[in-house]
Every structure is written in structure tokens, then in C-alpha cells.
Amino acid sequence: PDGNFVAYVAGGKPADIWYAPRYIAVISTTGGSPQFLGSDLDRNGGSPQITNDGQHVLFLLEDEGNRHLAKVPVSGGDVERVVAGERNISRFHLGSSDRLVVLESQPTYPAEISRVNDLGLTRISHVNDAHLAGIMLAPVERFTVSSADGTPIGGFLTRPPDQLNGTSLPTLLRIHGGPVSQYSTAFRFEWQLFAARGYAVVAANPRGSSGYGFAFSRAIWADWGNKDFDDVMAAVDYVIENDIADPDRLGVGGWSYGGILTNYVITKTGRFQAAITGASEVNYLSNYGTDHYQRQWEAELGLPWQNTELWIHLSPFFQVEKITTPTLVMV
């Protein structure tokens, strides 16, 4: 506000492409080197805003399936969580009078505006109240499982609201895109829709996801469909072993990288009775040069005419004869 600093999101090392952590940085308006704030947290930050007194930077902080509102001194120091807990803050605004409001959602209610005060949050908008009146929403449960190599994997389970103790439910494995993004405590209409139709919904954050640190995100570097496959399968095993899911009534699907990982799933196992893959690629050689991720593909996999074996190895197309799952392909 005093014009002395600019706060911005620093994208990390270019060589790390989309896996690079996003840090909050400030730089003097007179020039010089930037200062990175809160980088020791090993979590992605975003949407920075300098406070009215010029002493702190407010920002959004991803952390293990949540998105919190945090602040850090402009001069550097410890990060303080202004709004924490099991919630997803997608927007915030600090007014000239220091009134702070956030756009917040939780698994069982869509986004609403709340005022931040000494007692916590006070909701000041009620846009969704009328729509939700008389509707039974399903609670969303967190779970953590061990993947094949022992890596802990977090996820979310949504059961039909009228079958919260139901067993042997038809179950859908949903896979998020990115891969560097996360399923979170935000309200997800899709989960509620499927649950209302009688399905249990399993949504894990496999390696490659954000919110769990740089090493966790980069663990799938040039190794797609391997560790992340094990991770989502561990989530499916969890709901089967706990008699939540019917192993003979399983579906899987995702969009973008979620579709790509779905492609790996159906080439590696026949345990799903149906699959939907959307906005994905299957033959990376033929896809080369056709999308806006050219630099990222080359940085991670190399040039296809120089590293052809890897491009073929990672392309689900070359394993298509192993697919037995009925699959809907959406573009």
C-alpha cells in the first residue's frame, strides 16, 4: 500500500516445470533481489496481498487437502495461519478498513463469504441456503492409507447419505487432473451427485499431487502410471478391505491427467467394470507439438526423436491390448 514492495508468486526453478513449488516473494519497487517468504514450509502459496500497514503478506496456502489463509512478515519470519482447519479458502479480500473476508467452502456446503474476526469466521452470505434446504448431503470422510512402498496417501470418501453404514456399495474411483493439484475439503458437487445416486466415491491424492511437498509432487517425474497407480489402488483396496466397496462393482474415471492415469489403470488391471477417460492423451508421440505443454513435455521426457523409448514406454496406447474394461473416451 505504501508502494515500497511488490508481492508476487514465484514459480520455482523452471527446470522443475509444473512440479516446482510456488512461493510467495516480495521485491522492492526500487529493484534488487527478491525475498522468498515461507519457503521452508514446502507448500504452494498463492494470491498474495500486502496488508494495509505494509508489514505482512496475506496469501493462500495449500496443505494436505486444505487451503488456508496465512500471513508472513514482509521482512521474513514465521508463517501464521489466519484461517485454518478443515476448509478450503478460494478467495479473500482485505479492505481499506482492515475488514477481512474470505470465500470459503467445506465438503458439505458450497462457497459462501465469511468475515474473519477474533472469534473465527462469521458467514455473511447465504446464497446457497435456499437451494440446500431439504437436501440431504453426504458427509465426506478423510482417510490415509499406505501405498505399496509404504508411502502414506491421503484421500476422501463420500458414501450415499442414506447408507452411511452401508456395505458392498458400488464405488467410483475419481482421479484429479494436474497432476500437480489436490482433492481438498472444498465442496464438490460431483461427489454429492454420485453419492445421491447410491455410489460411494473414493478420491485420493496420489504422488504427483500438490499440498504434500515438492518431493511428493516430483515423485512421478518421467514415471507416470507407476507410483501414482499404486497410490490410487491402495485407496481402492482400503474401501474394499473395510467392506465399504463391492469389488465387483467398481468404476474409475478422471479428466486431463486424471484421464491419463485412468488410461494407465485400465492397462494394468481389469478390476474395474467401467471407466471414463476425458481430455487425456494415449500416444504421446502423436500428441507431440499439438498442445500448449510443449516445454513441459520436452523438459520431463526429452525430445521424442532422441528419447523415443521413454515416450513409447509411457504411452498407454502401446498397452492397449491389455484393456478389458469397457471405457468411454471423452475429448
Q: What name fits each language-model region?
A:
Residues 1, 7-25, 36-46, 60-70, ...:
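A flexible loop/linker signature enriched in serine peptidases of the S9 family
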Residues 32-39, 77-83:
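Blade-edge beta-strand/turn elements of extracellular beta-propeller
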Residues 60, 80-167, 189-192, 196-197, ...:
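Non-catalytic accessory segments flanking enzyme active sites
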Residues 163-169, 174-213:
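Short substrate-entry loop that stabilizes the transition state in hydrolases
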